[in-house]
Amino acid sequence: FHIFYLIDYYPYYIVSTPHNQKLFHIFVNPYKYCYHSRMQNKNILQYLNALNKIDGVGPKRMRQLMAFFISPQAIWEADLENLVLSGIGESLSQKIIEQRPHIDPEEEWRKLEKENVRMLLETDEEYPRLLKEIPTAPYILYMKGEMDLNAPMISIVGSRHHTPYGSQVAYAFAKELAQSGITVVSGMAFGIDSIAHRGALDAGGKTIAVLGDSLDEKNIYPASNLNLSREIAGSGCLLSDFPIETPAGIPGNFPARNRIIAGLSLGKLVIEAGEKSGTLITANLALEFNRDVFAVPGSIFSQQSLGTNNLIKSGAKTVTSIKDILEEINLEEVHKKSFAPAKIPSSQE
């Protein structure tokens, strides 16, 4: 049987079971086990958003804090001693103490609302299941727009310095994928990324832009893609794990963005990448996450195709038409899994 207690403002369950004439009591932090619905407690979200603005509080530290404290508000109000006891270290604990007086949780929440940005937690049923599988999954996702994040997705990435051939391929493949019911994911960078988003939009399909900055309009990067970002949010969505007012164009933020692009998708399609292109890093992430990597072959005389041709030599699947991708991912089976009920991963049980 289950009995709910509230002692000293710390709720917990006692699960009692007779075994060898003894009672075994299991103390459970309810925040760790419950799924949050779209009507999540506003207080919880406000404090989590505020914590996410503190330097050094990434997904790993956030999980440590949430496992130790009874609520996000308790974390926010904790003294140095208890923060250190949570296991996050004295340096980060001191940083939280120093930075939180300069952050107003309610004001930060109002900024989110003003920008029509909402938060998804990894315990939320809407949180993408594929992304939850990766070891570096964000604890918090910021989302602008509305769409099913568990729909089948393919990411398209490539060079900023594309050729006319690369542009033609990216647009055509994105358009055909969208027409086939696949959501096209990319990073809204110059070049292949932006062209892929445009192809999906022109097909009347769904596309997701994962950003390496926050979702407020003044920090959209590149700034020339502001109108594109509005179009994407209107029919698909923008995603980021960076809180409002995170400056645009910080180089270190792009690897964080890339792991979300790789984690969301069933597979990654690489269209034009130089020999040392950052796109290849994202392709390697996809392999680490057990995702398919597809590559479009290019001219052996083109610098922009050295990376993609090398990917193919290393085992990436050669793609010359959308049919190659659709056959590989078995779309009918994917659709069945997309509508399967959500389960709590074993790491969270």
What residue spans do the PLM features occupy?
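Short, positively charged patches
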Residues: Y35, M39-Q179, A340
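Extreme N-terminal basic, low-complexity initiation segments
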Residues: F1-Y9
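Alpha-helical and His/Cys-centered functional microenvironments
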Residues: L6, L23-H25, N29, S321
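Short terminal hydrophobic/aromatic SLiMs and anchors at protein ends
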Residues: Y9-T17, Q21, H36-S37
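Short, Lys/Arg-enriched N-terminal segments with co-localized hydrophobic residues
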Residues: I26-R38
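Glycine-biased, small-residue-rich flexible motifs in mid-sequence functional cores and linkers
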Residues: P30, Q40-K42, E122-E349
